[in-house]
UniProtKB/Swiss-Prot annotation:
Keywords: Cytoplasm, DNA damage, DNA recombination, DNA repair, DNA-binding, Endonuclease, Hydrolase, Magnesium, Metal-binding, Nuclease. GO terms for cellular component: cytoplasm; Holliday junction resolvase complex. Binds 2 Mg(2+) ion per subunit. It catalyses: Endonucleolytic cleavage at a junction such as a reciprocal single-stranded crossover between two homologous DNA duplexes (Holliday junction). Signal peptide: none annotated. The RuvA-RuvB-RuvC complex processes Holliday junction (HJ) DNA during genetic recombination and DNA repair. Endonuclease that resolves HJ intermediates. Cleaves cruciform DNA by making single-stranded nicks across the HJ at symmetrical positions within the homologous arms, yielding a 5'-phosphate and a 3'-hydroxyl group; requires a central core of homology in the junction. The consensus cleavage sequence is 5'-(A/T)TT(C/G)-3'. Cleavage occurs on the 3'-side of the TT dinucleotide at the point of strand exchange. Its cofactor is Mg(2+). GO terms for biological process: DNA recombination; DNA repair; SOS response. Mg(2+) 2 binds at E71. It is an enzyme of class 3 (hydrolase). The gene is ruvC. This is Crossover junction endodeoxyribonuclease RuvC. CDD domains: RuvC.
Length: 170
């Protein structure tokens, strides 16, 4: 017998960290909620990271996901920006891990491939496919949409692993 699994996807960012919560049962997906956690750009880095931590902790506590997925960081030419993104990503991984959740990581192209079928695509394609996969999905902005896509990527990957394990158990 299968159980419903609640997954939170997190799209880390220092200004805005997107989050999206879905439920999966077998191959079906159901939208639960999405949003963003923001930090005040006028504050020092440590205070901004605390804001992200507290906001994400509130989301995880409120929606009680079973598993979490976080997008991997890409390295760009601005080393300082990359380091700050890495620190925000650390918060995005720490919060669900401290709540006892297993945290999976996915490359941006793996997320796009899971949602739109190819590893390179436009934000508009992701938005459109989110509505196809979960017609009741509501998201404001790219960060929340990306977080939902990350959660869907994890749902597809965990389903593939479950199917392989079932086949091996035969």
């Amino acid at each position: 017998m299968q159980n419903t699994i609640r997954i939170i996807g997190i799209d880390p960012g220092l200004r805005r960290t997107g989050w999206g919560v879905i439920e999966t049962l077998g191959n079906s997906l159901r939208f639960v909620a999405s949003g963003t956690v923001t930090s005040d750009g006028e504050l020092d880095l440590a205070s901004r990271l605390c804001q992200l931590h507290d906001g994400l902790a509130e989301v995880v506590h409120g929606y009680q996901p079973h598993e979490a997925a976080v997008e991997q960081t890409f390295v760009n030419k601005d080393a300082t920006a990359t380091l700050k993104l890495g620190q925000a990503r650390g918060i995005a991984m720490l919060v669900p891990a401290r709540a006892g959740l297993r945290v999976a990581e996915y490359a941006p192209n793996a997320v796009k491939k899971a949602v739109i079928g190819v590893g390179h695509g436009e934000k508009q394609q992701i938005h459109m496919m989110l509505k196809v996969l979960m017609p009741k999905a509501e998201f404001k902005g790219n960060d929340a949409a990306d977080a939902l896509a990350i959660a869907i990527c994890h749902a597809h990957n965990r389903q593939a692993v479950t199917s392989r394990l079932a086949a091996l158990a035969g």
